[in-house]
Amino acid sequence: MIEISRRKLLAAGAAGAAASGAAEALPTRPWIRYQAERATANARARWRADMIRETYRMVWVAPDWNAKEMFEAFIGPDGIPTHGAACVTYPGDPGRRMAFVAIDTQDPNSITMLRTFKKLSHLIDFHIFPLAFLGPVSEFQGATILGAPNRALAMDDQITLFSQKGSNGIEYDVSRISEDSERKIWANTNLFRATRGVDVPFGVYLGMDGGYRPFNNQPDWDHYLALFDLVKAK
């Protein structure tokens, strides 16, 4: 006859009870799983909605401003700038959703926002339009970037140099800036004003729901992720 010690019996009993409790804790029935998934989806939707509402509260727009009108004034149906405007874009995944972005090379908030967008450019197709908004330096730097053989590289140089102490960004030679580049920077600036833009940085994103969402420099990463439909939950 095989003898089993009392200690082994107690251990086996405890293990069986734990397994039974764990099994009961799992949502074994389909409707329970459905309810749990629905609650999670609702929580995600509420989080995104809260983030987007908070983003809107931070954006300053004119009373008669129209998001769709501004977006389509800068970016045509084929994704090409219109009205003589010109922009900087970065390579990324095909089929990315588009965002119009107006910046000034001498505006610290614009540079901060662009630094963040560099991390998202493979997911969102940012069309970045430099403006001559804050003065002659902005005009000449913007024109230099738009006239560069590689605009994205020139913009990267501006972001890097502007962030260095004692530097206001890339150097430029007024005598070498083409008339075409000058026309483009002023086309950007005048179009922004014509569509009732009031401050930089400023942008409009075409969301997955077909809505046009205005934005500016946001306080944290989560706001951008929610705004650009990049996450479902925090």
Residue ranges and their predicted role:
Residues 16, 148-149, 162, 228-231:
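Alpha-helix boundary/capping residues
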Residues 134-223:
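Thiol/selenol-based redox catalytic cores and closely related redox-interacting motifs
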